[in-house]
Amino acid sequence: MTHYEQRLENDLSQIHTNVATVAGTIQQALKNAVYALLTGDSDLAYSVVLGDLAVNRAMRDIDRQCHAFVAQHQPSAGHLRRISSVLRLEIELERIGDYLASIAREAVQLSETPPDSVRKNIDFLADQVGKVLQNAIESFLDDDPELARTTKNVAYEIERTYESTFADLLNEGEKGTRPLRDLFALLIVFNRLGRIADQSKNICEDTLFTVTGETKQPKVYKVLFVDEKNDCATQIAEAIGHKSFPDSGKFDSAGWNPAENIDPALLGFIERRGHALDSVVASSLMSTAHEISDYHVIVSFGGNVLDHIAAAPFHTIFLNWDIAPGPADLESSNAEKELEDIYNELVRQISNLMLALRGENVD
């Protein structure tokens, strides 16, 4: 190894060591913030807030080291990817530190420690988040892409935990036994823990980019079209989505009171528009195939789908489109024209929706 190569490796090693030190500090701060919240330890809570200032200073030092490394060594390929990832990681760790300071500040505002039901949820969620954060950091420090992929998948599951804990918090609010300020504080705590899980996913993405050059794939959105019968407009919408945006979305349709059969005339119309059909049946909104919380967007035609489900999932967007129900008689002389109007309007609306979700590169 030449003198230049040795100096480059030494500088990289120093950056790696500093990142590991800050990451360890943040992991301990997570434990301290949650413990302070659950026990009412205000001294420990304020130590987390003060500790965040040291984290911010350490992040600025790492930032300076990275820029100096680029200026001195003019890295390329793997070394450049690593420094680029460290700069992103620096932002993610700093944000996590901010979230922990926020949890600590909310802890000292509580009138008393959280009630048992909420306490259990916080403890469980914090444990999940802590493991995900630890594994994400380990994947980065150890250049372990497989651990990064596994951890990403686990992090996605935390969203389901967040929804259940939110429901329990609402139940506590309905009892009226705690001040409204406490409930808002606990809601913020849950939100911050969820955001730490999100940042952990980003750290896993940094690992994959560093080790393999793999970049984050554009998000594929799950869209559900719903009306009463699921025997006309929603079937057309699903077919348009499949054909026009096969790589950007996954599309389904359902009805809250589905028809027994789909008119062959509708199937013929859809096929004449170049949409390949296998087996098309009217699907029930209540079917186990439609887990409402799995969808990013749910679009209802001719009625509000929220009137037909128990609760609106936290992360799902609900839209109402003014789409005609379709001709009463698909064999009538005007049926083709009515279907054509519905089809054209749906093409426009779905295109605008996917453009909003994915931007100009939608496909």
Question: Predicted segment positions?
Answer:
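Cytosolic, long alpha-helical scaffolding segments
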Residues: M1-F225
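Short polar/charged helix/loop
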Residues: A107, V220-D363
